[in-house]
Amino acid sequence: MPQPYDRVMSVLRLDNIGVFVSNLDAAIAFFDKLGLVLEGRQMVEGEFADACTGLTGQLCEIAMMVTPDGHSRLELCQFHRPAAAGNGADGPVNTLGVRKLMFAVTDIHDTIERLKAHGAELVGKVARYQDVYLLCYLRGPDGIIVALAEQLGDLS
């Protein structure tokens, strides 16, 4: 049986996850308190941007946040024009589409308290999965569902 690396592939890695927000500064502050690091911030507009997104005359500001290990990136984007379309942020956890971002944390309770100071609200409560994980869902900026997982024990 061929190993995954033996196949001809075009995907090298998952580069980033894009999250569209209404207040970029608030989103940066929230994810900073979670432990992500601001890697860069810039305005994006012009023919290349319009061609890529299919929007006409777009102007958006992006901020790239990176996890402490450097392996994962979160691209936060606030559109200045055209205005953002729709808001499914208040939908329940089982709404179709991308609904959550999960982060492994060292101390779930400390992380929750830091994020609550930036408007986060628990969706349910902190739950224990066997003796392996503490897990919870929070709502962050614009209703983004952020899941936290603190590993307690051996995964085997």
PLM region spans:
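Short acidic (Asp/Glu) patches
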Residues: 59, 84-86
